[in-house]
Amino acid sequence: MIEFDNLTYLHGKPQGTGLLKANPEDFVVVEDLGFEPDGEGEHILVRILKNGCNTRFVADALAKFLKIHAREVSFAGQKDKHAVTEQWLCARVPGKEMPDLSAFQLEGCQVLEYARHKRKLRLGALKGNAFTLVLREVSNRDDVEQRLIDICVKGVPNYFGAQRFGIGGSNLQGALRWAQTNTPVRDRNKRSFWLSAARSALFNQIVAERLKKADVNQVVDGDALQLAGRGSWFVATTEELVELQRRVNDKELMITAALPGSGEWGTQREALAFEQAAVAAETELQALLVREKVEAARRAMLLYPQQLSWNWWDDVTVEIRFWLPAGSFATSVVRELINTTGDYAHIAE
């Protein structure tokens, strides 16, 4: 299995180095749910600004303040502790009057707004995230500048970031041990983390192999294509390749790669043979996913950061802004820009 640091680059390995997250203010994330609170209902949506505390900690503190069980406070996604982040929490308070959340006190956390809502906010129920990153001590400004220009046109590999695999790859190692021993895993969180790491690693492997081809965005017979921003896909046939290639070049369609699991992967013929060969050596992880009934799915192979802009504060410091859809990783964008020092694994998804 290829480790994250050794995965194939779309724009070649960066020539320079730089520092990501010298301080929390260098990594700002603003959650985009894609909808507004209903203004009525038994739930309360609470938009918070936090710095130095993780999402679960804030959710538990909010539950205590509202005198409800911790399970009654939900969120769409975990946000990094060591960053400045805005996100929504959702508290279920049936039959209660609207509390004064301006009185909620927690170090490093501020309530920005809150309103009634009809539905629980579930994990993954967000449109995306807006990022503002500051890279410091950049050793090769010209290389980073050209890479930013290239990313605007060609995007970046849609890799799952190192944080998906745990510090030191612990989640993937857990999945491998589980696959090899077949010992039942009772802890639901471990099961979820390990299965997710296994499937994500196989996806990354397929994308890394595809990137080694001369033209990564060349449609081949049997490719599974999806409309940009949509989840469903269809299979490319030889008769349609010219027209489908035009639509891929126009970013109307995206070539996808497999998230292996039980059931059909979605590709056929040449594309299916390529994907199967790319992960042929990982029989244990594939068998684990099938055994645990994790359904196969598809994910876009490339990622195009939206609203990408940047500003050089000086020759060694650049501020970069962009928006990514839910499930994508800012660190996979940074990886194509600079060689960073430190481990990405501590950065929450």
Curated annotation (Swiss-Prot):
Keyword Isomerase: yes
Keyword terms: Isomerase, tRNA processing
Name recorded for this polypeptide: tRNA pseudouridine synthase D
Sequence similarity: Belongs to the pseudouridine synthase TruD family.
Matches recorded under InterPro entries: PsdUridine_synth_cat_dom_sf (IPR020103), PsdUridine_synth_TruD (IPR001656), PsdUridine_synth_TruD_CS (IPR020119), PsdUridine_synth_TruD_insert (IPR011760), TruD_catalytic (IPR042214), TruD_insert_sf (IPR043165), TruD_pseudoU_synthase (IPR050170)
Functional note: Responsible for synthesis of pseudouridine from uracil-13 in transfer RNAs.
GO terms of biological process kind: tRNA pseudouridine synthesis
Residue ranges of every copy of the TRUD domain listed in the record: 155-303
Record bears the keyword Isomerase: yes
Catalytic residue list: D80 (nucleophile)
Catalytic activity: uridine(13) in tRNA = pseudouridine(13) in tRNA
Superkingdom to which the source organism belongs: Bacteria
HAMAP family linked: TruD
MF (Gene Ontology): RNA binding; tRNA pseudouridine(13) synthase activity
EC number: 5.4.99.27
Binding, substrate: F27, N129, F329
Enzyme class of the recorded protein, top EC level: isomerase
GO terms for cellular component: cytosol
